C-alpha cells in the first residue's frame, strides 16, 4: 500500500485512513481529516491557515 498526501494541508495519509473526494470535473482529492474537508468545502486557502504545513513552508521560503 502506498501513502498519499492530503491535497489540502500536505500531510501524509496512512493507508486505510482519510477520504477520497471526487470533484464534479472528475479530479480526485485525498483528504486526511474532517478538519481539512470542512475547510476545503468552505473554500479556504491552506496557505493562509497557520495550522497547515503548507503555511509554514511558504512562510519560510519567502524569507530567503
From Swiss-Prot:
The record's keywords, sorted A to Z, are: Metal-binding, Ribonucleoprotein, Ribosomal protein, RNA-binding, rRNA-binding, Zinc, Zinc-finger
Q: Which Pfam families match?
A: Ribosomal_L24e
What GO cellular component entries does it have? ribonucleoprotein complex; ribosome
**Binding-site residues, Zn(2+):** 6, 9, 32, 36
Q: What is this protein called?
A: Large ribosomal subunit protein eL24
A GO BP term here is: translation
The beginning of the lineage is:
Archaea, Methanobacteriati, Methanobacteriota, Methanomada group, Methanococci
Functional description taken from the UniProt entry: Binds to the 23S rRNA.
Summarize subunit and interaction data from the UniProt record for this chain.
Part of the 50S ribosomal subunit. Forms a cluster with proteins L3 and L14.
Entries under Gene3D superfamilies matching the protein: Ribosomal protein L24e
**Required co-factor?**
Zn(2+)
Family per similarity comment: Belongs to the eukaryotic ribosomal protein eL24 family.
List the PANTHER family hit by this protein, alphabetically. 60S RIBOSOMAL PROTEIN L24, RIBOSOMAL PROTEIN L24
- What top-level branch of life does the organism fall under? Archaea
Point out the gene that encodes the protein.
Answer: rpl24e
Task: Recite the UniProt cofactor note for this protein.
Answer: Binds 1 zinc ion per subunit.
Zn finger region (C4-type): 6-36
Answer yes or no on keyword Coiled coil: no
For this protein, the record's InterPro entries field holds:
L24e/L24_sf (IPR038630), Ribosomal_eL24 (IPR056366), Ribosomal_eL24-rel_arc (IPR055345), Ribosomal_eL24-rel_N (IPR000988), Ribosomal_eL24_CS (IPR023442), TRASH_dom (IPR011017)
Q: Which PROSITE patterns match?
A: RIBOSOMAL_L24E (PS01073)
UniProt-recorded Gene Ontology molecular function terms: rRNA binding; structural constituent of ribosome; zinc ion binding
Amino acid at each position: 500500500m502506498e501513502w498519499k498526501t492530503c491535497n489540502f494541508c500536505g500531510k501524509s495519509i496512512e493507508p486505510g485512513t482519510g477520504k477520497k473526494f471526487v470533484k464534479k470535473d472528475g479530479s480526485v482529492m485525498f483528504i486526511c481529516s474532517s478538519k481539512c474537508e470542512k475547510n476545503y468545502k468552505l473554500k479556504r486557502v491552506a496557505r493562509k491557515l497557520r495550522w497547515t504545513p503548507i503555511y509554514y513552508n511558504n512562510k519560510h521560503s519567502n524569507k530567503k
